[in-house]
């Protein structure tokens, strides 16, 4: 079998999305900045995509800025936002995506900000009392906390954090790369100034994403060289990427409840079968709690054995693709910074299984059967 269970890293392109992109890859090739018909055709497609995305997120089209993906979007919001608003204090956590934590660490090293890390409980959820204390202490700070953790799946209460930030005059940015396309976001209700998305996390193309920037909190241009993207990001737009992103998000919203039901059942099936088949298996963070974590992610630690060091390799040899952590750092030798923050000093190995609408129950069963065989435990 050939089983893909690494959908938090990237998802396969939906064929319907590819069909939407094809005309803009082959026929509609004009530069959107050109005033002739070739340019106007693609410019219209870009602006239609922006309008559709804004409608799905309940914001205005001018608040959607296209980028190359989540990492660029997070960097732009942090670097340009801090500069634009003269922010000196940033509140974040130790388990953010590297696009956020590395950027903030560099800004702190450069003396541009003071970085304050909010406390976490043993499951990896933020300590809201500590967050409140930090907000009271550093009024006017920026808060950067991800909606859904890409490794353990923990969900942040965006409403609660947004209300706290509003109360203390804080700028709230959330990395929502893992949740856009899987959960609805109503930006008229959420008290959030900036958020990010990447199309390849919801069956769209790679190399395209967007950021939402609240119209009352516009940031300075972060890429010079052109007036594209409301004069915030210069450079010729990725037209067929934007068309693909729009099609993927429309498809995700149209089928969201059905996909959630299907994927949640797959995750529950894997949890039940692992507990039944492998004594000593544990779940990291709150990834086994369907209500408190992404329904697409399950982070698992297995009993200590010689098999742990070769587990991902052995799964790969059996045709199963999974991850030991964030795909953006899977080649690193330092292990998962998320698990290191939650379980300091622990030697536990971990595997992240992440699911999509294309996975099937028999793939879960096959995977658990192989894992059971690895650990020489009879079903």
Regions found by a protein language model. Give the residues of each.
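Pyridoxal 5′-phosphate
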Residues: 1-379
């Amino acid at each position: 079998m050939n089983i893909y269970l690494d959908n938090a890293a990237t998802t396969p392109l939906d064929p319907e999305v590819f069909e939407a992109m094809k005309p803009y890859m082959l026929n509609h090739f004009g530069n959107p900045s050109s005033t002739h018909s070739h340019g106007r055709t693609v410019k219209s497609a870009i602006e239609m995509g922006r309008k559709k995305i804004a409608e799905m997120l309940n914001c205005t089209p001018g608040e959607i800025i296209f980028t190359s993906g989540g990492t660029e979007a997070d960097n732009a919001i942090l670097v340009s936002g801090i500069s634009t608003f003269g922010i000196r204090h940033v509140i974040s956590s130790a388990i953010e995506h590297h696009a956020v934590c590395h950027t903030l660490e560099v800004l702190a090293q450069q003396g541009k900000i003071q970085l304050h890390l909010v406390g976490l409980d043993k499951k990896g959820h933020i300590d809201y009392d500590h967050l409140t204390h930090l907000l009271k202490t550093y009024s006017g700070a920026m808060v950067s906390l991800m909606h859904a953790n890409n490794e353990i799946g923990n969900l942040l209460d965006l409403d609660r954090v947004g209300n706290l930030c509003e109360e203390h005059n804080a700028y709230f940015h959330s990395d929502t790369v893992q949740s856009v396309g899987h959960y609805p976001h109503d930006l008229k209700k959420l008290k959030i100034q900036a958020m990010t998305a990447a199309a390849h996390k919801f069956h769209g193309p790679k190399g395209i994403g967007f950021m939402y920037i609240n119209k009352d909190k516009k940031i300075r241009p972060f890429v010079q060289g052109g007036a594209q993207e409301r004069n915030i990001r210069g450079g010729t737009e990725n037209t067929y990427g934007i068309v693909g992103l729009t099609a993927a998000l429309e498809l995700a919203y149209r089928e969201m409840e059905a996909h959630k039901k299907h994927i949640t059942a797959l995750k529950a099936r894997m949890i039940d079968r692992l507990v039944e088949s492998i004594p000593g298996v544990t779940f990291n963070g709150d990834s086994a709690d369907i209500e408190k974590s992404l329904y697409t992610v399950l982070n698992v630690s297995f009993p200590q054995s010689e098999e742990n060091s070769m587990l991902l390799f052995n799964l790969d040899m059996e045709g199963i693709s999974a991850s030991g952590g964030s795909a953006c750092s899977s080649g690193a030798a330092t292990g998962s910074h998320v698990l290191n923050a939650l379980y300091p000093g622990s030697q536990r190995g971990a595997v992240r299984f992440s699911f999509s609408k294309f996975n099937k129950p028999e793939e879960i069963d096959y995977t658990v059967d192989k894992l059971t065989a690895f650990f020489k435990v009879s079903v």
